[in-house]
Amino acid sequence: MGVEGILERGYVTTSADKLINWARTGSLWPMTFGLACCAVEMMHTAAGRYDMDRNGLIFRPSPRQSDVMIVAGTLCNKMAPALRKVYDQMPEPKWVISMGSCANGGGYYHYSYSVTRGCDRIVPVDIYVPGCPPTAEALYYGILQLQNKIRRTNTIAR
């Protein structure tokens, strides 16, 4: 958030936008949409070594309880409508992280007739995490970049 001004009497002044965005970055609840081997690396970020819980990131089982969707793995054409349906069930504001080469652009299976060439053709993607599969550190870095993106957005329309 960044403290804009600390006054002599011990209180802080800031804008409502920055306060709301600070609260949102500290309580992201991702929903897993694990489709292939990238999902295993996504599970590593929730394990003891990286422990996303300490930063307020708690995996939720329902799209109605989450505000971030992590699409990890190869998205087939038959799975694309289900991805869109789950995305539509998420409350606003919502963000999407595309994890891995297959989710980003089809990856190794790019020329297959049954593979969607990137989940950004189905849902709007905010952060792309490259790799095949990307490491847990790369996903964690992508989450940090999403937090930076949220801090830069204007929450209140003028």
From Swiss-Prot:
Q: Please, which domain of life does this record's source organism belong to?
A: Bacteria
- Record membrane topology: Peripheral membrane protein
What the entry lists under InterPro entries is as follows: NADH_UbQ_OxRdtase-like_20kDa, NADH_UQ_OxRdtase_20Kd_su
Q: Which PROSITE patterns match?
A: COMPLEX1_20K
In its keyword annotation, does this UniProt entry include 4Fe-4S? yes
Q: State where the protein is found.
A: Cell inner membrane
- What GO molecular function annotations does the UniProt record carry, in alphabetical order? 4 iron, 4 sulfur cluster binding; iron ion binding; NADH dehydrogenase (ubiquinone) activity; NADH:ubiquinone reductase (non-electrogenic) activity; quinone binding
Sequence intervals crossing the membrane: none
The UniProt keyword set, sorted, is: 4Fe-4S, Cell inner membrane, Cell membrane, Iron, Iron-sulfur, Membrane, Metal-binding, NAD, Quinone, Translocase, Transport, Ubiquinone
User: Main EC class of this protein?
Assistant: translocase
GO biological process terms, semicolon-separated: aerobic respiration; electron transport coupled proton transport
For this protein, what is the EC number? 7.1.1.-
Its signal peptide is none
The catalytic activity, as recorded, is: a quinone + NADH + 5 H(+)(in) = a quinol + NAD(+) + 4 H(+)(out)
Its cofactor is:
[4Fe-4S] cluster
Q: Which PANTHER family match?
A: NADH DEHYDROGENASE, NADH DEHYDROGENASE [UBIQUINONE] IRON-SULFUR PROTEIN 7, MITOCHONDRIAL
Kindly state the subunit structure of this protein: NDH-1 is composed of 14 different subunits. Subunits NuoB, C, D, E, F, and G constitute the peripheral sector of the complex.
Please report the name of this protein according to its UniProt entry.
Answer: NADH-quinone oxidoreductase subunit B
